[in-house]
């Protein structure tokens, strides 16, 4: 338990340190307060360059395409879809669900279920916080039942607090229910798929990743040259995943 907490805290600190916005702020502060004044213009120019690079949609898209898992699942059907948590706020409850920007994984799951591509839905995840008692999987299950998904088609794993535990506890749940020989479609956000798939491949489950087709490249002038503030956040998320992936490699989780 202590090791889990230390690993969790260290990963959060490291995630903050690789945030491009953090780098830009540091460079701007150096441009204002560096003792050697002749270096201040260099820091300012560096900050401007980083701002342009990390707010450029085309640069981000090209980089992300290299990171993204590619998989064609057309016309395949699966016994169950495994839906990873991380799509609601810690302030959520059964009566008041606050979805975040990662709710695409839930929408994709619903679409796949109603198309008959997945027969059952396994929801995995408690919360990504050591201090929260939130059981995200239970909340999502209640939501799915309210919107018409049959209760018997939903399976919950509500103990895991990170991607590694998602894989471990999901495998245990499937073995308990004698589902470990099923075919599974792994459903999460695209940026998170590489680490998730690697964790689940370490289990004995038959896993296939669900990946949507990439967006077409835009050639309008605004997309190509106008900086986008939301892209800074996308870079933060991507760097967090890259760091998380290699930390998991170091720990032997993937």
List PLM regions with ranges.
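Hydrophobic membrane-insertion alpha-helices, especially the h-region
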Residues: 43-57
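Structural signal for the C-terminal ends of transmembrane alpha-helices
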Residues: 30-38, 55-57
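A structural signal for short, hydrophobic/glycine-enriched beta-strand patches
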Residues: 53-229
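Short, Lys/Arg-enriched, disordered terminal segments
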Residues: 1-11, 37-38, 146, 178-179, ...
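Membrane-embedded alpha-helical segments of integral membrane proteins
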Residues: 2-34
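Short, aromatic-rich membrane-interface segments at the entry and exit
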Residues: 24, 39-44
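Hydrophobic alpha-helical segments of integral membrane proteins
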Residues: 6-14, 59, 63-67, 235, ...
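Periplasmic OmpA/Pal-like peptidoglycan-binding modules at the C-termini of bacterial envelope proteins
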Residues: 219-239, 243-245
């Amino acid at each position: 338990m202590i090791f889990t907490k230390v690993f969790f805290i260290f990963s959060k600190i490291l995630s903050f340190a690789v945030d491009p916005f953090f780098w830009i702020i540091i460079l701007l502060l150096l441009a204002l307060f560096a003792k050697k004044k002749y270096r201040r213009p260099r820091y300012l120019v560096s900050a401007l360059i980083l701002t342009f690079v990390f707010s450029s949609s085309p640069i981000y898209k090209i980089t992300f395409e290299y990171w993204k898992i590619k998989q064609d699942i057309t016309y395949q059907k699966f016994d169950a879809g495994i839906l990873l948590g991380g799509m609601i706020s810690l302030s959520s409850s059964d009566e008041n669900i606050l979805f975040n920007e990662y709710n695409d994984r839930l929408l994709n799951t619903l679409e796949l279920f109603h198309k008959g591509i997945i027969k059952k839905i396994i929801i995995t995840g408690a919360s990504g916080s050591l201090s929260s008692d939130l059981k995200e999987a239970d909340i999502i299950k209640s939501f799915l039942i309210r919107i018409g998904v049959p209760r018997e088609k939903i399976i919950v794993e509500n103990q895991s607090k990170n991607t590694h535990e998602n894989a471990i506890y999901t495998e245990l749940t499937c073995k308990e229910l004698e589902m470990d020989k099923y075919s599974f479609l792994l459903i999460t956000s695209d940026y998170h798929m590489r680490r998730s798939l690697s964790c689940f491949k370490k289990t004995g489950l038959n896993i296939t990743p669900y990946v949507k087709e990439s967006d077409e490249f835009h050639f309008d002038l605004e997309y190509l040259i106008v900086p986008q503030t939301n892209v800074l956040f996308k870079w933060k998320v991507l760097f967090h995943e890259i760091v998380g992936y290699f930390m998991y490699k170091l720990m032997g989780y993937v």
